Amino acid sequence: MVSSTSQIISTSPSRDDVVPSRKKVTLPPWLEVAKPRLIPLLLATTLGGMALSEGWPLPSPRLACTLGGGALAAAAAGALNCLWEQDLDGRMKRTSSRALPAGKLSPSAVFTGAISCTLAAAALLVSGVNCLAAGLSLLGLCSYVLLYTAFLKPRTSQNIVIGGVAGAIPPLVGAAAATGHIGLSGWWLFALVMVWTPAHFWALAILLKDDYRSVGIPMLPVVKGSVFTAKAIAQYGWATVLLSCFGVFALPEGGALYGILLVPFNVRLLQMVRRLAADPEDLQRAKGLFRWSILYMFGICLLLVVSRSTLADQFHNQAIYLFTNMGSVFSIA
């Protein structure tokens, strides 16, 4: 089994090619520990939570404070994650050159920066948005660092299923920023991100399973293998597609346009999931699914925003008119 796996890996693309941008772009150490590549998607889902609310569009100052505070909280979470896992990162080839294991930054400097970002995020959100948004952002930070990184990740192969709550909180922050409370629509996007996360992350874990195995992290592909993981990805992929359709009802307006534009996103996601299920050991297929899953969630959030535009309102009204007057439209005089 070991020899066959080695043969597959030797004829597959190098693991260094999983996320090429990490090799091509060298970030300053203080920026690297903030994990800036993760922040745009978190902010996109925050915008999605806003777009689902009756308070959309937000006043520009409140919008800026929400996104700025969210970015600071995410940066703090990334830095604390790097701080917690510095020994682990130092033992993996892929991460050994990161700022902390390589000695480019001191742990005390990273901790000070993380606390400063946390305080700045809280101050910005409390003063410029509301206490609920601030509290939710801090909850997301704590759940990522304490629940996922410190507790779940080293203990269970279902770590990302439960720990995915951290990445699903930004839509709630967006909803809270827009209206001061969390409605059913905000909880729908929270649930969508939760069920999307395992398929997204396990595709990456298939690519990096040897790294995780080398340091004893029980990611699902390490514990159950790529074939089992691909089946689990398919299940969560279908759940994501089905749950995404409820956005038609979650949107206050523009649901019809959202539903139409959603179709190609879901079709492509299912195609990528099916390709991986057909050959779970193909690293290119796993990489393709991982990348598309990111674009998929960006696309969902973009559709939510577009569906709340004036053009979407006009489309929605025309669709309702045609539906309610279908008899007269197609009647023959």
Curated annotation (Swiss-Prot):
Q: EC no.?
A: 2.5.1.141
Location comes to: Cell inner membrane
**Does the keyword Transferase feature in the UniProt annotation?**
yes
Catalytic reaction equation(s): heme b + (2E,6E)-farnesyl diphosphate + H2O = Fe(II)-heme o + diphosphate
What's the chief localization of this chain? membrane
Q: Which keywords accompany this UniProt record?
A: Cell inner membrane, Cell membrane, Heme biosynthesis, Membrane, Transferase, Transmembrane, Transmembrane helix
Which domain of life does this protein belong to?
Bacteria
Any Pfam family from its record, for instance, is UbiA
Q: In which pathway does it act?
A: Porphyrin-containing compound metabolism; heme O biosynthesis; heme O from protoheme: step 1/1
Identify the stretch(es) annotated as Disordered.
1-21
One example of the protein's molecular function in GO is:
protoheme IX farnesyltransferase activity
**Per the UniProt entry, what are the Gene Ontology biological process annotations, in alphabetical order?**
heme O biosynthetic process
Q: How does it sit in the membrane?
A: Multi-pass membrane protein
Q: Where are the transmembrane segments?
A: 38-58, 63-83, 109-129, 132-152, 160-180, 188-208, 245-265, 286-306
Functional description taken from the UniProt entry: Converts heme B (protoheme IX) to heme O by substitution of the vinyl group on carbon 2 of heme B porphyrin ring with a hydroxyethyl farnesyl side group.
Protein name, as recorded = Protoheme IX farnesyltransferase
Species per Swiss-Prot/TrEMBL record: Prochlorococcus marinus (strain SARG / CCMP1375 / SS120)
What gene name does this entry carry? Answer: ctaB
